[in-house]
């Protein structure tokens, strides 16, 4: 998108021109067609491709399959981080992200949750051969993102550290528009319900779930870490004399289009309880009778949970 007609100002026009030609060639050969369909299904399951149909019945099937990109805000125990690259010069392609969720269930059935977000900018080592104008090379640009953290429902924010202060965030210099701008009613209402907390963290509500938001700027060749600490009252029902088994589960949500994100979820339970069964099996480790940890690349939504028994 660096070389295009600036007067026409359609940097993505090549995609509109190329798509019908590419699809026609891919679907002509039966063998290629099968590989193409397998690739499309894989991309949809990993949220690299989102599908929308005007037919409501068909669209509902896409939602049920997880191919529509709908955010599951109604789920009680969400573990989600949404990242928006704003004036980040396409530098996300060089950034590794690690999400560490540490969930410690207390004897009173509350939970202490710590989320550690680490972003590492590998532009200088990976973008050496990138053929773009030197002044526009994203490998050597700051990675500027606005992140929204969606913790489990009812989470109370205890502390946050490591965020970039709003005054330190690079700002775009935009020209004065020729036409008068009219505030969008939905955006105005969304912003009205937000609260700015100490340090510049923002608390809000979107897509049926509460979130906490912050800026994060990572320079080329460096790492940046943000840590959130929450308390979740009445997080779950522990096994008891009258109900000797219970279940705890959380949905680790993958952001559509995201790549290079790795996640770790650690579940810790109090004395008197043991883990009878845990998921997922792939990437999961039973650290002890009362602790289960999952590690893996976040390629799709992943349910992490355990069946608990009273000892």
Each PLM stretch: what is its role?
Residues 1-311:
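Lumenal/extracellular ectodomains and adaptor appendage modules
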């Amino acid at each position: 998108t660096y070389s295009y007609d600036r007067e026409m100002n359609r940097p993505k026009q090549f995609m509109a021109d190329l798509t019908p030609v590419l699809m026609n060639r891919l679907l002509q050969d039966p063998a290629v067609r099968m590989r193409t369909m397998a690739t499309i299904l894989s991309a949809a399951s990993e949220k690299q491709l989102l599908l929308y149909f005007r037919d409501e019945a068909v669209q509902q099937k896409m939602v049920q399959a997880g191919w529509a990109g709908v955010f599951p805000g109604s789920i009680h125990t969400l573990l989600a981080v949404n990242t928006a690259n704003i004036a980040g010069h396409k530098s996300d392609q060089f950034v590794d992200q690690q999400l560490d969720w540490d969930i410690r269930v207390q004897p009173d059935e509350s939970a202490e949750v710590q989320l550690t977000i680490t972003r590492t900018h590998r532009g200088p080592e990976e973008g050496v051969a990138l053929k773009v104008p030197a002044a526009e090379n994203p490998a050597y640009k700051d990675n500027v993102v606005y992140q929204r953290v969606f913790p489990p429902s009812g989470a109370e924010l205890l502390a946050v550290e490591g965020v970039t202060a709003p005054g330190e965030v690079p700002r775009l210099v935009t020209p004065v528009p020729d036409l008068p701008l009219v505030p969008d009613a939905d955006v105005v209402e969304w912003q009205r319900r937000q609260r700015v907390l100490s340090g510049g963290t923002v608390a809000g509500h979107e897509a049926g779930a509460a979130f906490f938001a912050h800026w994060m700027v990572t320079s080329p060749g460096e790492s940046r870490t943000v840590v959130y600490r929450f308390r979740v009252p009445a997080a779950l029902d522990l096994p008891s004399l009258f109900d000797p088994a219970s279940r705890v589960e959380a949905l680790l949500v993958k952001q559509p289009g995201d790549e290079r994100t790795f996640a770790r979820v650690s579940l810790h339970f109090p004395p008197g309880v043991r883990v009878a069964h845990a998921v997922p099996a792939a990437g999961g480790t039973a650290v002890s009778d009362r602790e289960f940890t999952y590690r893996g690349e976040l390629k799709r939504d992943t349910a992490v949970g355990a069946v608990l028994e009273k000892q």
